[in-house]
């Protein structure tokens, strides 16, 4: 994940102790920078200087290039200019976002004392600075840096060697919402578990990262992995450190974590303490994820089915994009959680389906809830920012607005006969902390600043002393105006002004030509004290003005101090209610997802699936959810629905396997994918694109659809296919669903046929799983005579005037041929090539290939003279038509001539057989 410096060594700052003489030593400020940078050598250092974060040396070179900002220089080091660039503090979030996206870590170094305090230690004293946080991809909380629709997970991956091999555990945290989960894993499913969570950053121990036996894993994960010292994962004090963080006396009764799980949990906590430094985000206690409670989907299957993103990394075209009708960030994140981890317990799935059913039967209620939820605030992320000291008044308003929505929704749901899941939601809403809600309503002003340091966020009449200080501060404007009028009259200088800046404070300003009246008159000179001479003006003050300034400054400063004290009190009250806020936010997300899936079902005509523990897989008129919507948007032909029945047949113990044949472009891959997606949608607790669906819970879903090279690891398409097929054959159970497309296509015909043949037999005889297998080997259709649970189905086609029409219908039986030449014709290959291919195919089909290679070469010479002549004839026909079109000038033709030209073109077409 970390970017490596690759510049010359003379751009790397040397510590002050390495210099031979004091003349060579860097300035005190640069000494301080070098000391801090040495501690955070693996991060870009944002070094606060006034209103800017400055970067020096290699950091400046890399940041300037990554951010597209100007690279300049400041001072010298070892006789060379020190590269420097900077970004404004007020715009730092935008620059941080770019750096994090480029894979950098950033150490944010702030001034920890006021410059005035530093001067008390001596005129050359440097303002104290220290790093207050490390910004990494997995630990960001700023609203600008986060995608509201996506969780931002930091994952820790722990490994403990045992006498039997290796134990693995994963923990993952979203510090922006407080989610904290942990699970054990195994080497063969490690990548699948990681891909399911989809973390932004992964923490591993150095030794684990550099272990050659796991090199392939970390090659896949690439830049999101951050190796850390082994001490981060040490379990010696793990229980104590975990208890300290969560303020527990013991972990007994909380969870019986394994040693490997403890290692993953404590590593996450220590890394958060390391990066957040002075603050602790309010995290929920680690929740253990039960492996058997969710549908296992391996990494290759997730990629090929394009659940969250397409293979090119885009959200458009994914299943998520097709089904997401949520209106809140929390709802969108929950929908993703459900989509990446479908359930395997029918009762839990039915609980979710009951909620959707309820809103389908109560559309007016669903509409009312949707209107209230729309654009609802993200309370957990606001709480996290407040707890970490990065929140502002608007984050408090987010909590207040969230409470208002909860109160309104509680009233809407009250007195309704609710399904279990929605009833639980309503119960949570009924526990709204009314006192905190009222406190926030009374305290917060209507128009809030972004930053608390700007003040003005506490409502008038909320705090008596604050109102008094504000009155004095605001009244001063009138007093200053009166004093200005008095001085103007007293000096007879009508243009005299009282102004203010941060250097001089309040001062009297007159033009240089008018200054003699104050500087030459002894009485005026004693009263008006000279402060500054400008090119065209002179500035003065008076004892009276200085006293007034002191009173105003005190009032303004004291007013801000009081506001900040009130802010801190409110933050503490909010943090005390963090458990309710977290549960309420989850309840809001559940409500959003339930209503959204009801809208989806109504809009797309989806049905409620029947889910049980059987081996049934019976889909009536199933459709592909993504392709169907894409066709509708294009106003194209409607999607052709197809049945799929892999259920246990009479007198059979296990479910069926379908062997699918048919032409390319006939819809085989779409049919394969749609059934896998229907299974996922059903088990995530959604209605599905079908007329009816009965699905026995799938424990593992395997999908091998589409070619994928793995060039980075030196694997070809065929090698990848074999690795993925091996995973399927080694791990599929009789409750699994397997989707395989064109197994064995990446090698010779006989090798491929042999592998496909053996794989089908193994799935039938050993795995006993439900499966749909597409193949271009027509010889395999004979297997149905040998394997009683294997059934031939094919994609229906129709011949029309020598052309093939794909009907996209799945029917019983086997394909009579491949229709490859017809597909080539549709793709636009030249007519001569199509004619030649048809001749070659005809001769090949007349006899067996084996033993007749030389005869075929003689019979089928490469584009013979006759063929070449045909090509020339074809070209001449097109040239004649092209010439006729060139000679037509539409603007010069009469209606009769235009009609004659059309007849001429039609005759050319007929004569040339075009």
UniProtKB/Swiss-Prot annotation:
It comes from the Bacteria. ATP binds at residues 662-669. Belongs to the DNA mismatch repair MutS family. It comes from Bartonella tribocorum (strain CIP 105476 / IBS 506). GO terms for cellular component: cytosol. One of its GO terms (molecular function) is ATP-dependent DNA damage sensor activity. PANTHER family: DNA MISMATCH REPAIR PROTEIN MSH1, MITOCHONDRIAL, DNA MISMATCH REPAIR PROTEIN MUTS FAMILY MEMBER. Signal peptide: none annotated. One of its GO terms (biological process) is mismatch repair. This protein is involved in the repair of mismatches in DNA. It is possible that it carries out the mismatch recognition step. This protein has a weak ATPase activity. CDD domains: ABC_MutS1. Coiled coil: none annotated. Keywords: ATP-binding, DNA damage, DNA repair, DNA-binding, Nucleotide-binding. Residues 11-25 have a biased composition (Polar residues). This is DNA mismatch repair protein MutS.
